[in-house]
Regions:
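Loop-to-helix entry region at the N-terminal start of transmembrane alpha-helices
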Residues: 314-320
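Alpha-helical transmembrane segments
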Residues: 321-325
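Polar-ligand-bearing catalytic/cofactor-coordination segments
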Residues: 3-313, 328, 332-405
Length: 405
């Protein structure tokens, strides 16, 4: 009975995802909002429609195949059968189980990643990744993911085993500290995949530095990241507690005018000025606490893991169960988190506009959307559930009419 309920929950989650795709599919046929109709000319508009259709079909096939594979693993108790093959201690067996299924998940994802990059993205001019970079990225992601997962998993297992129910509180604290650690060393992780070169002296660097000095914000350095070795898309970010590190994609530096780049940075600087990252972390900590409490409940009921063939509680599989039962709650958290994030985006846009970069930011956002073939007309319900940023039309309207927001 427990197994049936959990499997139904898993199936419903995937059906819900397909419903969202269908909603977007129907809504995209509506006329574009007036203030974004100049983003695509007829040729670019048709290219966007084709790109969207290809991406949608691929995403649906990927979701269906991975869901069927996962469903098969759950129905036939594959996790428990693999776990039973090891016949060693609890800790070693769990570590081996993590290694096996993380490797399995990685191998399953490789054909999809390859098709996405070297067929769809290549077809529409986005992909710049070589086979060598593609393979190296997979290896690096796998190794880093395994190390971080084992640290997190072994820590959680130790705390629950040592302190039992009280371990929930210690686990919440440990996972929060783990997330802070990952945030603090985000640049270190990025350097494993990308090369960062200091931005040369000139008009752009002077403009960025002047904005920071105006608000007494100290900078570690301003870097240009070699994003062009993987994609034609562009981005920028500002990170760090205390002294800030600014990173601009080389695609942004090479293909956008100085005023647009400064406008994009002013937006990112607005996030730093208003401490949006720190504020978002508090909500993330609350979410983590709820999920750990839910995990504690699962671990206190061995019958849940036993329904999938285990003799007792299995910590690794308990995380899988957590994803199956928590998706409705996660959707609610996602909706709240995205609402907060969209509010922060409006504030950051407003900061850039108040600095005199409103129209330059609009121009940059339009160019970014055009270059990335962004969906300019997503369904409002999908935006509410899944979009961390307002739509381009909403952002333009808010920049030009700030009193409406």
């Amino acid at each position: 009975m427990i197994k049936t309920i959990l499997l139904i929950s898993f199936i419903l989650e995937n059906i819900f995802d397909f419903i969202l795709v269908k909603l977007n599919d129907n809504y995209v046929k509506k006329p574009l909002p007036e203030n974004v109709r100049d983003v695509y000319d007829e040729e670019k508009y048709n290219k966007w429609i084709n790109y969207r259709n290809d991406s949608k079909k691929f995403s649906c096939v990927q979701t269906l195949i991975t869901a069927l594979i996962s469903l098969g693993l759950y129905i036939f108790n594959v996790h428990a059968k693999v776990f039973g093959l090891f016949g060693t201690g609890k800790i070693v067996s769990n570590i081996l189980l993590i290694l096996v299924f993380t490797l399995f998940s990685t191998l399953i994802s490789i054909p999809f990643s390859y098709y996405s990059n070297f067929v769809i993205e290549e077809k529409y001019g986005f992909n710049k990744t070589t086979i060598k970079t593609f393979i190296l990225d997979i290896v690096k992601e796998f190794l880093i993911g395994i190390v971080l997962m084992l640290i997190l998993f072994l820590g959680v297992m130790f705390l629950f085993e040592k302190f039992h129910n009280l371990g929930i509180l210690f686990t919440i604290a440990a996972v929060i500290l783990f997330n802070v650690f990952v945030s603090l060393f985000s640049m270190t992780f990025l350097r494993i995949f990308n090369k960062f070169t200091p931005l040369e002296d000139g008009e752009l660097r002077s403009s960025l530095t002047a904005l920071c000095e105006k608000y007494n914000v100290k900078i570690k350095n301003i870097y240009v990241m070699d994003a062009s070795k993987r994609t034609t898309r562009a981005n920028a970010f500002c990170t760090g507690f205390g002294k800030k590190t600014i990173s601009l994609d080389d695609n942004l530096v090479n293909n956008y005018s100085t005023d647009k780049i400064v406008a994009v940075f002013a937006h990112e600087f607005g996030h730093a000025k208003y401490k949006h990252v720190l504020k978002s972390m508090w909500f993330a900590f609350f979410r983590i606490s709820i999920l750990i409490l839910s995990l504690g409940i699962i671990l206190n009921f061995p019958v849940i893991c036993q329904a999938f063939g285990f003799e007792d509680v299995n910590y690794f599989f308990a995380f899988s169960v957590l994803t199956m039962i928590s998706w409705p709650i996660s959707r609610i958290f996602d909706m709240a988190s995205n609402k907060i994030s969209r509010t922060f985006e409006y504030q950051a846009d407003g900061f850039a506009a108040n600095e005199g970069y409103g129209e330059s930011l609009i121009g940059a956002l339009k160019q970014l959307s055009k270059d990335a073939l962004t969906n300019l007309n997503p369904h409002p319900f999908v935006v509410m559930l899944e979009y961390s940023h307002p739509t381009l039309s909403q952002r333009i309207d808010a920049i030009r009419n700030p009193k409406k927001k």
